[in-house]
A protein has these predicted regions:
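Histidine-acidic metal/acid-base catalytic patches
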Residues: 3, 23-37, 41-59, 170, ...
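Active-site acidic/histidine proton-transfer and metal-coordination neighborhood
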Residues: 92, 96-180, 189-190
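Bacterial Sec-dependent N-terminal signal peptides
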Residues: 1-26
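Metal-dependent catalytic neighborhoods of phosphoester/phosphodiester hydrolases
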Residues: 71-75, 113-116, 261-262
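Glycine-rich, proline-tolerant flexible connector loops at the mouths of alpha/beta enzymes
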Residues: 62-87
Length: 279
């Protein structure tokens, strides 16, 4: 390699590193972009964390029922996990330097709700993503205040209970600030709803998001595309959240190309950072 080529190579490396640093520094305050472990449901949590670490992602939302390790059958189900299982999860998170920011989508019986909050507290999880019904809200509100853990109501597509933002908005009136929503923008798109309009209706109650960019609008069986290439208006979503002063977690929930979707997740998060750096 001649001297000119060497200098050009160094310049290219410098520019790439500079862009990466600027993108990180340009992230709005309190924004944590990571992945829903369900994206990698064909793999164990151990493999999921390894995948995320390999692309520099440091936040994960766990879900109930995923195998914890490559070997063994114990899962992340809070109702059956052992002390050894929780210790294993902590060790895996520590090994890959990844923070478990949320857990869900999870519902619990009245009897199991305290166990769910205990599980989250022990693992340092600050958000429980759920579709709990309003008849549990009094108990949930007390637990949120006691544990200082947030409960985020998640929306699946129509006709699920929370498919329309008006429902969650109405049910959360007068409730603790620790209770809010996990806005799944892909399921809004499947339901024929504009994600930006939905976010406006929920301003002040948004705790976290599941981000999907879908190939079709208003179609239940639409599938994921890399962010910025589909119908979910991800850039518009980020601009609206920035306007609201939102601080919280974003989870990539990529439910397509199941066997090899890590490149799509990496491309999506790179797009997120480019948009966020310009806000």
């Amino acid at each position: 390699m001649n001297n000119k080529s060497f200098k050009l190579g160094l310049l290219s490396l410098f520019l790439m590193l500079s862009f990466h640093i600027q993108a990180q520094e340009g992230m709005p305050k309190g924004w944590k972009v990571g992945s829903q472990a369900y994206t990698f449901r064909l793999f164990s949590l151990e493999e999921t964390l390894e995948k995320l670490n390999s692309i520099g992602v440091k936040y994960v939302e766990m879900y109930p029922g995923q195998k914890i390790s490559k070997s063994g059958n114990e899962t992340t189900d809070f109702t059956s996990i052992t002390a050894d299982g929780k210790a294993k999860i902590k060790a895996l998170l520590n090994k890959d330097d990844i923070e478990a920011v949320a857990y869900g989508v999870v519902n619990a019986s009245d009897e199991d709700l305290p166990k769910l909050f205990d599980f989250a507290k022990e693992l340092g999880i600050g958000i429980l993503t759920s579709e709990s019904k309003p008849n549990q809200f009094d108990q949930i509100e007390k637990l949120c205040e006691e544990y200082q853990i947030k409960l985020a109501l998640h929306n699946h597509p129509v006709p699920s209970y929370y498919w329309h933002p008006e429902v969650a908005s109405r049910m959360l009136e007068g409730r603790s600030e620790l209770m809010g929503v996990c806005a799944d923008i892909g399921h809004w798109v499947r339901s024929g709803l504009n994600p930006v309009d939905c976010l406006k209706q929920l301003e002040g109650r948004i705790i976290s998001l599941h981000i999907k960019d879908l190939n079709k609008f208003g179609v239940r069986d639409a599938h994921d595309l890399p962010w910025g290439t589909g119908t979910s208006n991800v850039a518009g979503v980020l601009h609206e959240l920035h306007r609201q002063g939102f601080e919280g977690a974003f989870s990539a929930e990529y439910e397509h190309n199941w066997e090899n979707n890590l490149p799509d997740v990496e491309e999506s998060i790179a797009y997120f950072k480019r948009v966020a750096a310009q806000l």
